[in-house]
Amino acid sequence: MNVTQQHKELSPDMVLSKALLNVGKALNLTQVELASIVGKDRSTLKKGIKPDSVPGQLASLVIRLYRALYVLVGGKKIDMLHWLQTENVHTRGVPVDQIQTVTGLNDVVNYLDAMRGKT
């Protein structure tokens, strides 16, 4: 099977799951942390996430967070990790801890969107 055929066979559920796992790797988040953020069991993350489900919407927010942060720091991984792991007076906490709740994830994504001028 060539690469084109392989991509055609990926369902939206699998694409979202794979994107979330890739973001997790880029941000040094474990599968356990990702699963906790999106409200799924770690063992089910690789089986796909329905985009229109609550976990799917949360996964999309995590991906949006990554994309916004990537743009803001010019794609520098060390700066992305520093931002995530450092106390932030504007978000009133440490973003990596804040994104463990739905409210915190939403607040952090909204903050990043505002910083990018996407309000």
Functional labels for PLM-detected ranges:
Residues 1-119:
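Non-transmembrane "mature" sequence context
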